[in-house]
């Protein structure tokens, strides 16, 4: 594994270390001030753990980065650690997930590490990871948790490209196709509440023939951006978003979300079979839907939403990719 924790005074950065025997289990672990930078045994990519920590740690004391070649689920692992008493903010990255989870319990498949070079024109000729999957655990105490997944999605979209849109409540879309998904869970340790924010992003094209709609991939927009560079671009902005949300809730993000709302003005079908026209979101992040019975406010995490028809002018499905977290 790769681990980075901000060095303490009197300790030099760049010290290489191996994980302690038996420390792969759940629970609180003490990595001290040890540092592993760059490639580590079992990892395909060289990860910018130090650069991320230098940007994040001043605003998030105790912040650490951990990268694993493979795990069942980054969200599941962080939830296990929280239940075992973990208290430090931690970014956990996995090059491969074997039992990834999405919203409403759906399975999420991460791309195999070391995937073949992308076939999108302009993509890097170097081997790439087909997807980026990571989870961030940190103490969070907002007055209202409503709209958190929307704020996280907005942070991802803002960090990447103006063309990206947001599908309520937890997806990032490119031309009506899913590019990324978000899964947020919470847990408690003593008097503190912790959030685990999981994000999965499709990077390279993959076989999408078994999916109803083939997902988008980041190489269509940013062919030179690989998983480590993508992580460095996303995480500092994500931490700032979470801290802003903790203090002010969703309201400061509402207007920016509306500008990227993929559903607004479109006929949609709810998971209960009812239909209506999406009318944006309110200051808490609730979905507003015009129905024959009047305005309906959708807040339940158990409600799924899909357009009743494709967006006019959107690219036709057919570019293969890797499904993202949630739905």
Residue ranges of predicted features:
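Long, positively charged amphipathic alpha-helical accessory segments at protein N-termini or as interdomain linkers
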Residues: 2-10, 14, 31-45, 51, ...
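Short loop/edge segments at beta-strand edges and connector loops
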Residues: 69, 166-168
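N-terminal lobe of the biotin/lipoate ligase/transferase fold
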Residues: 2-159, 224, 312, 317-327
């Amino acid at each position: 594994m790769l681990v980075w924790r901000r060095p303490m005074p009197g300790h030099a950065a760049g010290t290489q270390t191996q994980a302690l025997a038996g420390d792969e289990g759940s629970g609180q672990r003490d990595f001290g001030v040890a540092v592993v930078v760059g490639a580590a045994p079992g990892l395909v990519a060289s990860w910018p753990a130090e650069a991320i920590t230098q940007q994040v740690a001043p605003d998030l004391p105790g912040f650490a980065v951990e990268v694993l070649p493979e795990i069942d689920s980054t969200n599941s692992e962080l939830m296990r650690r929280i239940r075992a008493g973990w208290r430090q903010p931690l970014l956990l990255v996995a090059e491969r997930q074997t039992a990834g989870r999405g919203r409403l319990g759906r399975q999420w498949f991460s791309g195999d590490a070391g995937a073949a070079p992308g076939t999108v024109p302009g993509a890097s000729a170097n081997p790439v990871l087909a997807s980026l999957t990571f989870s961030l655990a940190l103490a969070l105490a907002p007055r209202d948790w409503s709209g958190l997944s929307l704020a996280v999605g907005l942070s991802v979209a803002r960090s990447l490209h103006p063309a990206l849109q947001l599908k309520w409540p937890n997806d990032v879309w490119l031309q009506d196709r899913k590019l990324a998904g978000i899964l947020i869970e919470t847990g408690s340790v003593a008097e503190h509440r912790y959030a685990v924010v999981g994000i999965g992003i499709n990077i390279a094209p993959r076989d999408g023939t078994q999916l109803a709609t083939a997902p988008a991939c980041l190489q269509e927009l940013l062919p030179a951006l690989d998983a480590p560079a993508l992580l460095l671009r996303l995480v500092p902005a994500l931490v700032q978003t979470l801290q802003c949300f903790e203090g002010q809730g969703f309201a400061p993000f509402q207007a920016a979300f509306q500008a990227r709302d993929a559903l607004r003005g479109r006929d949609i079908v709810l998971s209960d079979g009812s239909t209506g026209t999406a009318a944006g979101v309110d200051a808490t992040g609730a979905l507003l839907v015009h129905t024959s019975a009047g305005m309906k406010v959708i807040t339940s995490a158990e409600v799924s939403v899909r357009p009743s028809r494709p967006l006019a002018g959107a690219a036709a499905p057919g570019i293969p990719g890797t499904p993202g977290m949630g739905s």
